[in-house]
Amino acid sequence: NLGKQWAVGHFM
């Protein structure tokens, strides 16, 4: 999921 990938990139 794109949303998850973006979130992971921002939070990690």
From Swiss-Prot:
Biological processes, Gene Ontology terms: defense response; neuropeptide signaling pathway
Modified positions (Methionine amide) in chain numbering: M12
Ranges in coiled-coil conformation: none
Classification via PROSITE patterns: BOMBESIN
The organism's place on the tree of life at top rank: Eukaryota
Broad class of the protein's primary localization: secreted
GO cellular component terms given for this protein: extracellular region
Localisation: Secreted
Tissue and organ expression note: Expressed by the skin glands.
Alphabetically ordered keywords of this record: Amidation, Amphibian defense peptide, Secreted
Family as reported in the entry's similarity comment: Belongs to the bombesin/neuromedin-B/ranatensin family.
Annotated protein name in UniProt: [Asn3,Lys6,Phe13]3-14-bombesin
Biological classification of the source: Eukaryota, Metazoa, Chordata, Craniata, Vertebrata
